Amino acid sequence: MKQSSPTYLKHHFLIAMPHMADPNFAQTVTYLVEHNDQGAMGLVINRPSGLNLAEVLEQLKPDVLPPARCQHIEIYNGGPVQTDRGFVLHPSGLAYQSTLELGELAMSTSQDVLFAIAAGTGPEKSLISLGYAGWEAGQLEAELSDNAWLTCPADPAILFDLPAEERLSAAAACLGVNLSLLTAQAGHA
């Protein structure tokens, strides 16, 4: 019998099914930054934290007044792991002190990207989050097997061009799914 290679979902969206009980992930869409045999890492992209970039910059450099535009740049809850650490998703092409290229996207984790965004010299489009979602080896696969998530290839337009409250339904629509029509009960055929 031929063994099949595992399918990894890097650069995909995880769409929480209606029966998702974990409050960290109920009604979320998560961008998978990495997924391999060691586990997975992602950022929830539709949970505004209530903070804005100006408030974060005031904590980083209290002696410098952030530009007014920073008050309109939302910070997201990226997940329950390392919630004091920042992650910035943006289109690839710009590199900062700590940038991981992800194909057409990149993720930066150094403060210089935040100051570049504030100065108007950073990426034109970005999603800034505090914290991330992490799965140990085999954990995400088990959740997928339990029908906790739908998956689809990530779409940068959903990440950067839609308001947070539209991202979940838009990601599901990529699969032709209306989440409001799904039952909260899971099963296997």
From Swiss-Prot:
One of its GO terms (cellular component) is cytosol. It comes from Pseudomonas paraeruginosa (strain DSM 24068 / PA7) (Pseudomonas aeruginosa (strain PA7)). NCBIfam families: PRK00228.1-1. HAMAP family: UPF0301. SUPFAM superfamilies: VC0467-like. Belongs to the UPF0301 (AlgH) family. This is UPF0301 protein PSPA7_0505. Pfam families: DUF179. Signal peptide: none annotated. InterPro entries: AlgH-like. It comes from the Bacteria.
